[in-house]
Regions:
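Short hydrophobic alpha-helical segments enriched in small aliphatic residues
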Residues: 11-13, 23, 30
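Long, low-complexity intrinsically disordered regions
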Residues: 8, 28-321, 327-330, 335, ...
């Protein structure tokens, strides 16, 4: 197995990425390394949000096909099980699509439009990228889950083979299909042996997730979940895999600095500007200037038309919504700080007495800016969406229009959660609470 960190030479080999080398109307060509026009920070931010599907409010009702399309646009959708409000993958989709039935995500998985993999963390990804992720994971074993799978493979392979034979003969299984001896647990969060073996086989690529039932994984043989794996696979050199994921990350981010690219798919090492020279020279990536940045920005060639709109000031931010802590826009703390002047850290793993904002805090996106954050809990039995604490971004004062936008976004989220009564417990500053309550009454009345 090759080591995780390899010398990179992006673009030297043919890339498996499918994005066009030059978008229609692009003015940037292969040998040119820097765009002569710079962007203002707000223009760069709008380009970032547009690429992520968060710049403009939805203009129509969501359709089932929007689930896979949304994940295709982001290139991945991180999975997390915390559910004081809706679980993160559902919330990330709601931030972009508006109201939709949660079962659409399960249907997209079961129908083979998307699959589960280790990418940024545990993620859903487009089925078109299956071979790319499998090849990269086989090469790098970059995640803790993959490293655990390798250790289990070495230590307990006979058990894995017996479990595989069970699935081959009897069909898909859940970990709950196996009884757990009372009081006995394994090494991974107290998991029983069969759960660890299933996860190991998933990490090894021998099993895939066929579907989810009540968000619980259902495991089956990889070739039954994705029959195309039985077909001959393309051979990719390490540089080709690096290039493909680098291009996908740059495209998903809209505009990025080199040092932020690696975090999107958790590739190694962190990139330097010189690592992207070849892609820039080949015209697959454009190097731009952003006012106030101490480093160049990078835009994928597929976004050339959108970049021109951003520079011309023709991207308009109209969307207000709540974001998941695991939304790609905020999961990189440094990137969120540079784009939005917003210092965000997830505190659910911090001892309660040391938390500043709350357990599961949702950033508030309002027309292209992060203007605050709130700690919420959906009391489903009572039908109440509780805002336990809301903090306005330090140094800012909300306008009446922003209060209205946030109140409407809160009510939309509450309705989608099935908890239509919004309860404001505490805000900072305190006077925001009364203004929000008035705006919420107006939102309900309208």
């Amino acid at each position: 197995m090759l080591p995780n960190c390899r010398k990179r030479s992006f673009g030297d080999a043919k890339s498996p990425a499918t994005a066009p080398r030059h978008a229609a109307g692009a003015e940037w060509h292969g040998a040119q390394t820097t765009v002569s026009t710079s962007l203002q920070l707000a223009q760069a931010r709008y380009l970032h949000l547009a690429a992520q599907g968060l710049l403009q409010a939805p203009t129509r009702a969501a359709k089932p096909t929007d689930i896979a399309a949304c994940i295709q646009r982001m290139a991945l959708l991180q999975i997390d099980t915390i559910h004081v409000v809706s679980r993160s993958p559902y919330l990330v989709l709601h931030s972009r699509l508006g109201d939709y039935p949660r079962e659409w995500l399960e249907e997209a998985l079961a129908s083979g439009q998307i699959f589960e993999t280790w990418a940024h963390e545990a993620c859903f990804a487009p089925m078109d990228d299956l071979r790319l992720h499998r090849a990269y994971n086989r090469l790098t074993r970059r995640h803790w889950g993959l490293a655990k799978a390798d250790k289990t493979h070495v230590a307990q392979r006979p058990h894995l083979d017996k479990l595989l034979e069970h699935i081959r003969n009897l069909g898909p299984v859940k970990s709950s299909d196996f009884e757990r001896p009372e009081g006995k647990g394994g090494a991974w969060w107290g998991w029983k042996d069969e759960k660890r073996w299933l996860e190991a086989l998933f990490g090894l690529g021998e099993l895939m997730i066929a579907r989810r039932e009540n968000f619980h994984r259902v495991y089956d043989l990889s070739e039954r979940v994705a029959p195309k794996l039985l077909q001959p696979a393309p051979e990719w050199a390490p540089a080709e895999l690096d290039t493909a994921l680098t291009e996908k990350a740059i495209a998903a981010l809209g505009i990025t600095q080199a040092r932020w690219v690696h975090d999107y798919f958790r590739t190694k090492p962190r990139l330097k500007d010189s690592d992207l020279d070849t892609l820039v020279e080949q015209g697959r990536v454009m190097r731009v200037e952003v006012q106030g940045w101490d480093a160049p920005g990078y835009v994928h060639a597929s976004h050339a038309a959108m970049l021109k709109k951003a520079i011309a000031g023709r991207l308009e931010a109209t969307h207000t919504t709540l974001l998941s802590p695991f939304d790609p826009v905020v999961w990189d703390r440094e990137r969120a700080s540079v784009f939005f002047d917003f210092d965000y850290r997830l505190e659910c793993y911090t001892p309660e007495e040391k938390r500043v904002y709350g357990y599961f805090v949702l950033p508030i996106l309002c027309r292209g800016e992060l203007i605050g954050r709130l700690d919420a809990k959906a009391h489903r039995a009572e039908g109440v969406f509780e805002v336990r604490a809301l903090h306005v971004q330090p140094g800012t004062v909300w306008t009446a229009a922003q209060v209205t936008d946030v109140a409407q976004a809160l009510q939309r989220s509450a309705d989608w959660h099935g908890t239509p009564q919004v309860r404001i417990t505490r805000t900072q500053p305190a006077k925001v609470a009364a203004a929000l309550r008035r705006a919420l009454k107006e939102a309900v009345a309208s």
